[in-house]
Design a protein with these regions (language model features):
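Core beta-strand elements of the Rossmann-like FAD/NAD(P) dinucleotide-binding domain
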Residues: 5-7, 155-164
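N-terminal Rossmann-like FAD-binding beta1-loop-alpha1 element of flavoenzymes
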Residues: 7-34, 346-350
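Central helical "cap/lid" subdomain
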Residues: 42, 50, 162-223, 287-291
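Short beta-strand to alpha-helix junction loop
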Residues: 61-69, 94-120, 267-276
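Flavin-binding catalytic cores
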Residues: 205, 217, 247-302
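FAD-binding beta-loop-beta segment adjacent to the flavin cofactor pocket
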Residues: 244-248, 298-325, 329-331
Length: 360
Protein backbone atom coordinates (compact mmCIF):
# COMPACT_ATOMS: atom_id res chain seq x y z
CA UNK A 1 0.00 0.00 0.00
CA UNK A 2 1.33 3.44 -0.93
CA UNK A 3 2.02 5.79 1.94
CA UNK A 4 3.43 9.30 2.24
CA UNK A 5 5.76 10.37 5.05
CA UNK A 6 6.25 14.08 5.70
CA UNK A 7 9.70 15.35 6.60
CA UNK A 8 11.35 18.71 7.11
CA UNK A 9 14.31 17.83 4.88
CA UNK A 10 15.59 14.78 3.01
CA UNK A 11 19.18 14.00 2.03
CA UNK A 12 19.88 11.32 -0.56
CA UNK A 13 23.20 9.58 0.07
CA UNK A 14 24.78 8.81 3.45
CA UNK A 15 28.40 9.21 2.44
CA UNK A 16 30.58 11.87 4.01
CA UNK A 17 28.84 14.68 2.06
CA UNK A 18 25.34 13.62 3.08
CA UNK A 19 26.34 13.10 6.70
CA UNK A 20 27.98 16.52 6.89
CA UNK A 21 24.92 18.15 5.31
CA UNK A 22 22.72 16.44 7.90
CA UNK A 23 25.00 17.67 10.66
CA UNK A 24 24.49 21.29 9.56
CA UNK A 25 20.73 20.92 9.23
CA UNK A 26 20.35 19.31 12.65
CA UNK A 27 22.50 22.08 14.15
CA UNK A 28 20.10 24.59 12.58
CA UNK A 29 17.15 22.89 14.27
CA UNK A 30 15.88 21.06 11.19
CA UNK A 31 14.71 17.47 11.13
CA UNK A 32 16.36 15.25 8.54
CA UNK A 33 15.72 11.90 6.91
CA UNK A 34 18.98 10.59 5.46
CA UNK A 35 18.64 7.86 2.82
CA UNK A 36 21.14 5.41 1.33
CA UNK A 37 20.61 2.35 -0.82
CA UNK A 38 23.60 0.57 0.75
CA UNK A 39 23.43 -1.49 3.94
CA UNK A 40 25.47 1.04 5.88
CA UNK A 41 26.72 4.61 5.86
CA UNK A 42 29.99 5.87 4.41
CA UNK A 43 29.68 5.55 0.65
CA UNK A 44 33.17 5.18 -0.77
CA UNK A 45 34.71 5.44 2.68
CA UNK A 46 34.32 1.68 2.67
CA UNK A 47 35.89 -1.14 4.68
CA UNK A 48 35.48 -4.85 3.97
CA UNK A 49 36.31 -8.08 5.76
CA UNK A 50 37.67 -11.14 3.98
CA UNK A 51 37.77 -13.78 6.68
CA UNK A 52 40.00 -12.32 9.39
CA UNK A 53 41.48 -9.75 6.98
CA UNK A 54 40.26 -6.14 7.06
CA UNK A 55 40.77 -3.82 4.10
CA UNK A 56 39.73 -0.36 2.97
CA UNK A 57 38.68 -0.71 -0.65
CA UNK A 58 37.35 2.77 -1.43
CA UNK A 59 38.93 5.99 -0.17
CA UNK A 60 42.27 5.12 1.40
CA UNK A 61 43.04 8.14 3.57
CA UNK A 62 42.15 11.79 3.91
CA UNK A 63 43.87 15.08 4.61
CA UNK A 64 42.66 18.15 6.47
CA UNK A 65 43.19 21.71 5.24
CA UNK A 66 40.09 23.63 6.32
CA UNK A 67 38.83 24.58 9.77
CA UNK A 68 35.29 23.19 9.41
CA UNK A 69 36.31 19.67 8.42
CA UNK A 70 39.23 19.90 10.82
CA UNK A 71 36.79 20.38 13.69
CA UNK A 72 34.90 17.23 12.71
CA UNK A 73 38.14 15.26 12.46
CA UNK A 74 39.32 16.59 15.83
CA UNK A 75 36.10 15.34 17.46
CA UNK A 76 36.49 11.95 15.79
CA UNK A 77 40.15 11.77 16.80
CA UNK A 78 39.25 12.42 20.42
CA UNK A 79 36.72 9.58 20.20
CA UNK A 80 39.32 7.23 18.70
CA UNK A 81 37.50 6.98 15.37
CA UNK A 82 40.41 8.38 13.33
CA UNK A 83 44.19 8.37 13.73
CA UNK A 84 47.10 9.80 11.78
CA UNK A 85 48.56 7.22 9.42
CA UNK A 86 51.62 9.00 8.02
CA UNK A 87 52.89 12.13 6.25
CA UNK A 88 53.32 10.73 2.75
CA UNK A 89 53.91 7.62 0.64
CA UNK A 90 56.43 6.07 -1.69
CA UNK A 91 55.85 7.19 -5.26
CA UNK A 92 57.55 4.25 -6.95
CA UNK A 93 57.53 1.38 -4.47
CA UNK A 94 61.09 1.89 -3.27
CA UNK A 95 62.16 2.80 0.24
CA UNK A 96 63.82 5.92 -1.15
CA UNK A 97 60.85 7.07 -3.21
CA UNK A 98 59.02 8.69 -0.32
CA UNK A 99 56.64 11.51 -1.24
CA UNK A 100 56.20 13.17 2.15
CA UNK A 101 54.97 16.76 2.12
CA UNK A 102 54.39 17.35 5.82
CA UNK A 103 50.60 16.97 5.68
CA UNK A 104 49.06 14.29 7.87
CA UNK A 105 47.29 11.43 6.11
CA UNK A 106 44.45 10.27 8.33
CA UNK A 107 42.73 6.89 8.43
CA UNK A 108 39.86 5.39 10.35
CA UNK A 109 40.79 3.72 13.63
CA UNK A 110 39.57 0.33 12.41
CA UNK A 111 38.95 1.28 8.79
CA UNK A 112 37.75 4.21 6.73
CA UNK A 113 34.11 3.63 7.64
CA UNK A 114 34.86 4.65 11.22
CA UNK A 115 34.63 8.39 10.49
CA UNK A 116 31.20 8.29 8.79
CA UNK A 117 29.94 5.89 11.45
CA UNK A 118 31.09 8.29 14.17
CA UNK A 119 29.24 11.19 12.51
CA UNK A 120 26.14 9.02 12.01
CA UNK A 121 26.14 7.91 15.65
CA UNK A 122 26.20 11.53 16.79
CA UNK A 123 23.36 12.41 14.41
CA UNK A 124 21.01 9.78 15.79
CA UNK A 125 22.19 10.16 19.39
CA UNK A 126 20.50 12.00 22.21
CA UNK A 127 22.39 15.23 21.49
CA UNK A 128 20.53 15.64 18.18
CA UNK A 129 17.17 15.63 19.95
CA UNK A 130 15.86 12.90 17.67
CA UNK A 131 15.92 15.22 14.66
CA UNK A 132 17.79 12.81 12.36
CA UNK A 133 16.63 9.46 10.99
CA UNK A 134 19.03 7.39 8.89
CA UNK A 135 17.48 4.80 6.58
CA UNK A 136 19.89 2.43 4.86
CA UNK A 137 18.78 -0.11 2.28
CA UNK A 138 16.42 2.58 0.96
CA UNK A 139 16.40 2.95 -2.82
CA UNK A 140 15.18 6.27 -4.21
CA UNK A 141 13.53 5.92 -7.62
CA UNK A 142 12.98 9.60 -8.48
CA UNK A 143 13.03 13.15 -7.15
CA UNK A 144 10.20 15.45 -8.19
CA UNK A 145 8.07 18.32 -6.88
CA UNK A 146 4.37 18.80 -6.19
CA UNK A 147 2.36 21.31 -4.17
CA UNK A 148 5.48 23.32 -3.34
CA UNK A 149 7.30 20.37 -1.77
CA UNK A 150 9.91 17.85 -2.87
CA UNK A 151 8.55 14.34 -3.42
CA UNK A 152 10.96 11.41 -3.10
CA UNK A 153 9.36 8.04 -3.96
CA UNK A 154 11.17 4.90 -2.77
CA UNK A 155 11.04 1.43 -4.26
CA UNK A 156 9.05 0.14 -1.25
CA UNK A 157 6.01 2.29 -2.31
CA UNK A 158 6.79 4.92 0.35
CA UNK A 159 6.97 8.55 -0.78
CA UNK A 160 8.78 11.12 1.34
CA UNK A 161 7.44 14.66 1.12
CA UNK A 162 9.94 17.32 2.22
CA UNK A 163 10.34 21.08 2.34
CA UNK A 164 13.83 20.73 0.83
CA UNK A 165 16.25 18.12 -0.48
CA UNK A 166 19.99 17.63 -1.00
CA UNK A 167 21.32 15.03 -3.44
CA UNK A 168 24.84 13.72 -2.75
CA UNK A 169 25.27 10.63 -5.00
CA UNK A 170 27.67 10.81 -7.96
CA UNK A 171 26.32 13.54 -10.25
CA UNK A 172 25.15 11.22 -13.08
CA UNK A 173 23.06 9.26 -10.57
CA UNK A 174 21.57 12.45 -9.13
CA UNK A 175 20.67 13.63 -12.63
CA UNK A 176 19.01 10.27 -13.33
CA UNK A 177 16.81 10.70 -10.23
CA UNK A 178 15.86 14.25 -11.21
CA UNK A 179 15.15 13.22 -14.79
CA UNK A 180 13.01 10.29 -13.59
CA UNK A 181 10.98 12.84 -11.64
CA UNK A 182 10.50 15.08 -14.68
CA UNK A 183 12.72 17.88 -13.37
CA UNK A 184 14.46 18.83 -16.58
CA UNK A 185 15.16 22.38 -17.67
CA UNK A 186 12.86 21.91 -20.66
CA UNK A 187 9.99 20.40 -18.67
CA UNK A 188 10.02 22.70 -15.67
CA UNK A 189 10.26 26.46 -16.13
CA UNK A 190 11.53 27.07 -12.62
CA UNK A 191 14.47 24.72 -13.09
CA UNK A 192 17.86 26.36 -13.52
CA UNK A 193 19.14 25.80 -17.11
CA UNK A 194 22.67 26.92 -16.18
CA UNK A 195 22.68 24.49 -13.27
CA UNK A 196 21.75 21.60 -15.52
CA UNK A 197 24.48 22.53 -18.01
CA UNK A 198 27.03 22.63 -15.20
CA UNK A 199 26.01 19.25 -13.82
CA UNK A 200 25.80 17.52 -17.19
CA UNK A 201 29.47 18.24 -17.89
CA UNK A 202 30.65 16.27 -14.84
CA UNK A 203 32.42 13.00 -15.69
CA UNK A 204 34.03 10.28 -13.59
CA UNK A 205 36.71 7.65 -13.99
CA UNK A 206 35.84 4.15 -12.82
CA UNK A 207 38.22 2.18 -10.60
CA UNK A 208 38.83 -1.48 -9.92
CA UNK A 209 39.69 -2.23 -6.29
CA UNK A 210 41.40 -5.60 -5.92
CA UNK A 211 41.80 -7.06 -2.44
CA UNK A 212 44.40 -9.80 -1.92
CA UNK A 213 44.81 -11.74 1.33
CA UNK A 214 48.41 -12.98 1.54
CA UNK A 215 50.02 -15.88 3.38
CA UNK A 216 52.96 -13.70 4.47
CA UNK A 217 53.86 -9.98 4.80
CA UNK A 218 54.01 -8.01 1.56
CA UNK A 219 56.92 -6.10 0.03
CA UNK A 220 55.09 -2.76 0.21
CA UNK A 221 57.48 -0.31 1.93
CA UNK A 222 56.56 1.52 5.14
CA UNK A 223 54.19 3.09 6.03
CA UNK A 224 52.17 0.66 3.93
CA UNK A 225 51.18 2.61 0.83
CA UNK A 226 52.46 3.31 -2.67
CA UNK A 227 50.90 6.24 -4.52
CA UNK A 228 52.24 5.82 -8.03
CA UNK A 229 53.08 8.83 -10.17
CA UNK A 230 50.82 9.04 -13.21
CA UNK A 231 53.96 9.21 -15.36
CA UNK A 232 54.88 5.68 -14.26
CA UNK A 233 52.61 4.39 -17.00
CA UNK A 234 51.45 1.18 -15.33
CA UNK A 235 47.85 0.15 -14.69
CA UNK A 236 48.17 0.43 -10.89
CA UNK A 237 47.54 3.80 -9.24
CA UNK A 238 47.73 2.72 -5.60
CA UNK A 239 48.70 -0.21 -3.38
CA UNK A 240 48.07 -0.36 0.35
CA UNK A 241 49.15 -2.96 2.87
CA UNK A 242 46.26 -2.89 5.33
CA UNK A 243 48.26 -4.74 7.99
CA UNK A 244 51.00 -2.09 7.96
CA UNK A 245 48.25 0.53 7.84
CA UNK A 246 47.10 -0.77 11.19
CA UNK A 247 43.58 -2.01 10.45
CA UNK A 248 44.11 -5.70 9.61
CA UNK A 249 45.53 -8.47 11.80
CA UNK A 250 46.76 -10.35 8.71
CA UNK A 251 48.48 -9.26 5.47
CA UNK A 252 45.99 -8.00 2.88
CA UNK A 253 46.61 -5.67 -0.05
CA UNK A 254 44.25 -3.15 -1.62
CA UNK A 255 45.17 -2.41 -5.23
CA UNK A 256 43.50 0.40 -7.17
CA UNK A 257 43.74 0.36 -10.95
CA UNK A 258 44.15 3.67 -12.73
CA UNK A 259 41.36 5.30 -14.72
CA UNK A 260 42.63 4.25 -18.15
CA UNK A 261 42.87 0.56 -17.21
CA UNK A 262 39.53 0.64 -15.42
CA UNK A 263 37.77 2.23 -18.40
CA UNK A 264 39.35 -0.17 -20.85
CA UNK A 265 38.48 -3.28 -18.84
CA UNK A 266 35.24 -2.14 -17.21
CA UNK A 267 33.25 -4.94 -18.86
CA UNK A 268 36.05 -7.51 -18.87
CA UNK A 269 35.26 -10.66 -16.84
CA UNK A 270 36.41 -10.18 -13.23
CA UNK A 271 38.76 -13.18 -13.24
CA UNK A 272 40.65 -11.71 -16.20
CA UNK A 273 40.91 -8.31 -14.51
CA UNK A 274 42.25 -9.90 -11.32
CA UNK A 275 44.84 -11.90 -13.27
CA UNK A 276 46.09 -8.78 -15.06
CA UNK A 277 46.36 -6.72 -11.88
CA UNK A 278 48.01 -9.50 -9.87
CA UNK A 279 50.61 -9.87 -12.59
CA UNK A 280 51.47 -6.16 -12.35
CA UNK A 281 51.51 -6.34 -8.53
CA UNK A 282 54.05 -9.20 -8.42
CA UNK A 283 56.96 -7.00 -7.22
CA UNK A 284 55.10 -6.31 -3.95
CA UNK A 285 54.00 -9.90 -3.27
CA UNK A 286 56.50 -12.25 -1.63
CA UNK A 287 56.62 -15.61 -3.34
CA UNK A 288 54.57 -16.93 -6.22
CA UNK A 289 51.16 -15.18 -6.30
CA UNK A 290 49.59 -18.51 -7.25
CA UNK A 291 50.26 -19.73 -3.71
CA UNK A 292 50.92 -16.49 -1.78
CA UNK A 293 47.42 -15.12 -2.52
CA UNK A 294 45.05 -17.15 -0.36
CA UNK A 295 41.89 -15.12 -1.00
CA UNK A 296 40.93 -12.39 -3.44
CA UNK A 297 38.00 -10.12 -4.21
CA UNK A 298 37.36 -7.48 -6.86
CA UNK A 299 35.13 -4.44 -6.46
CA UNK A 300 34.20 -2.24 -9.41
CA UNK A 301 33.60 1.42 -8.58
CA UNK A 302 31.73 2.94 -11.52
CA UNK A 303 31.98 6.55 -10.29
CA UNK A 304 35.30 6.53 -8.45
CA UNK A 305 37.07 9.79 -9.24
CA UNK A 306 35.49 12.91 -10.78
CA UNK A 307 37.54 14.09 -13.75
CA UNK A 308 35.50 17.29 -13.94
CA UNK A 309 35.43 19.39 -10.78
CA UNK A 310 32.80 22.05 -10.11
CA UNK A 311 34.59 24.78 -8.12
CA UNK A 312 31.42 25.77 -6.22
CA UNK A 313 30.50 23.60 -3.21
CA UNK A 314 26.96 22.96 -4.48
CA UNK A 315 24.64 23.54 -7.41
CA UNK A 316 21.02 24.53 -6.76
CA UNK A 317 18.61 22.87 -9.18
CA UNK A 318 15.55 24.55 -7.73
CA UNK A 319 14.89 27.26 -5.16
CA UNK A 320 11.13 26.75 -4.76
CA UNK A 321 11.16 24.16 -3.33
CA UNK A 322 14.91 24.07 -2.64
CA UNK A 323 16.86 21.19 -4.21
CA UNK A 324 20.65 21.09 -4.50
CA UNK A 325 23.36 18.69 -5.65
CA UNK A 326 26.56 18.28 -3.64
CA UNK A 327 29.30 15.70 -3.14
CA UNK A 328 32.75 14.70 -4.26
CA UNK A 329 32.61 16.46 -7.65
CA UNK A 330 32.28 19.81 -5.89
CA UNK A 331 35.12 21.87 -4.42
CA UNK A 332 37.68 19.09 -4.96
CA UNK A 333 37.74 15.30 -5.39
CA UNK A 334 39.16 14.48 -1.96
CA UNK A 335 37.28 13.33 1.14
CA UNK A 336 37.58 16.84 2.55
CA UNK A 337 36.14 18.30 -0.65
CA UNK A 338 33.06 16.08 -0.35
CA UNK A 339 32.70 16.92 3.34
CA UNK A 340 33.05 20.66 2.69
CA UNK A 341 30.47 20.42 -0.09
CA UNK A 342 28.03 18.68 2.25
CA UNK A 343 28.57 21.26 4.99
CA UNK A 344 27.94 24.10 2.53
CA UNK A 345 24.82 22.41 1.13
CA UNK A 346 23.41 21.89 4.61
CA UNK A 347 23.97 25.53 5.50
CA UNK A 348 22.42 26.64 2.19
CA UNK A 349 19.26 24.59 2.71
CA UNK A 350 18.91 25.77 6.31
CA UNK A 351 19.19 29.41 5.18
CA UNK A 352 16.70 28.98 2.34
CA UNK A 353 14.14 27.32 4.60
CA UNK A 354 14.67 29.92 7.32
CA UNK A 355 14.05 32.66 4.75
CA UNK A 356 10.87 30.99 3.56
CA UNK A 357 9.65 30.69 7.15
CA UNK A 358 10.40 34.38 7.79
CA UNK A 359 8.52 35.42 4.65
CA UNK A 360 5.59 33.17 5.58
Amino acid sequence: MNRTVDSDTVIVGAGIAGLCAARELVAAGRSVILLDKARGVGGRMATRRLGSAVCDHGAQFFTVRGRAFGGIVAEAHEAGAVVEWCRGFSRDGSLGGHGGDGHARWRGGRGMTDLPREIAAALIGEASGGRCTIRTGAKVVAVTTADGRVQIPLDDTTTLSAAGCILTPPVPQSLDLLTAGGLTAAARKSAEPAAWATLEQVAYDPCFALMLVLDRPSRVPPPGGIQFDAAAGGPIAWIADNQQKGISPVPVLTIHADGAFSRRHFDTPPDEVMTLLIDHARPWIKGDPATAVIEKSLHRWKFALPTTIIPEPLVAISHTPPIACAGDAFAGPRVEGAASSGLAAGRWLARVLAGEAARG
